[in-house]
């Protein structure tokens, strides 16, 4: 399944496909330096799948949790890119949930005033919501998302297969946003939760949730109201 976020020159494709993680290199140029940002909650096999497609992949695996959205970790990513000679033609790839996406996206927005950002969400909530829209940020002085930027990815690849490794509680909790979206704007999506096993229909759930998020972003990219 494929969607296109239509934002003029900042438009990009959103791919929802089982096995999509192994095809990222077919969808966007990875024949360059790629900072692959992940955390300890992401299976190592996913990281290896991405790195195998990169000509010069530079992995950074951070601690799992909200504390990673810090000035310290942000600086760490920028320093690694500088030490490896990243230029504006290179890329940052987020492999993880919303925390990884927020942090990696802000690093991509900031390094040399912006490098290519690729988002490969691996949690339920990030696949159905936070991976698109361009909001990137870190926390500062105990306040969430104080410092950040609107910076759209060049590609989003949501591979539902990556959700199979999540604890069941985390998988179910992440679906709350999809249930809310169904109640508000998509009766068919809501009915999926009443009649189907969410695991069996997860690709459709992700797709239909992102359709609604995409429509909101296209109308009001920067939440101007």
For each of these PLM feature ranges, what is it?
Residues 1-91, 200:
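ATP/NTP phosphate-donor binding region
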Residues 196-225:
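Active-site segments that bind and position negatively charged phosphate/pyrophosphate groups
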Residues 15, 106-198:
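A glycine/threonine-rich phosphate-anchoring loop and its flanking beta-alpha core
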Residues 75-78, 176, 180, 190-191, ...:
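Predominant activation on well-ordered alpha-helical scaffold segments within soluble catalytic domains
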Residues 19, 72, 170-173, 188, ...:
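Conserved active-site and cofactor/substrate-binding residues in soluble primary-metabolism enzymes
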């Amino acid at each position: 399944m494929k969607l296109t976020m239509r934002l003029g020159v900042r438009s990009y494709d959103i791919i929802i496909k089982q096995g999509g993680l192994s095809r990222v290199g077919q969808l966007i140029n990875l024949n360059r330096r790629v900072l692959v940002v992940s955390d300890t909650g992401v299976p190592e096999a996913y990281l290896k799948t991405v790195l195998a497609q990169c000509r010069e992949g530079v992995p950074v695996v951070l601690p799992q949790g909200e504390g990673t959205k810090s000035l310290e970790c942000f600086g760490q990513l920028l320093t690694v890119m500088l030490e490896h000679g990243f230029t504006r033609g290179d890329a940052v790839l987020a492999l993880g949930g919303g925390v990884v996406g927020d942090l990696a996206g802000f690093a991509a927005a900031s390094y040399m005033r912006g490098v290519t950002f690729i988002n490969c969400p691996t949690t339920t909530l990030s696949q159905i919501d936070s991976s698109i829209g361009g909001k990137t940020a870190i926390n500062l002085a105990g306040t969430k998302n104080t410092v950040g930027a609107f910076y759209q990815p060049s590609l989003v690849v949501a591979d539902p297969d990556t959700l199979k490794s999540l604890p069941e509680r985390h998988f179910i909790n992440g679906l709350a946003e999809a249930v809310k979206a169904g109640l508000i704007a998509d009766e068919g999506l809501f009915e999926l939760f009443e009649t189907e096993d969410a695991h069996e229909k997860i690709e459709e759930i992700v797709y239909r949730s992102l359709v609604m998020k995409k429509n909101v972003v296209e109308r009001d990219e920067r939440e101007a109201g």
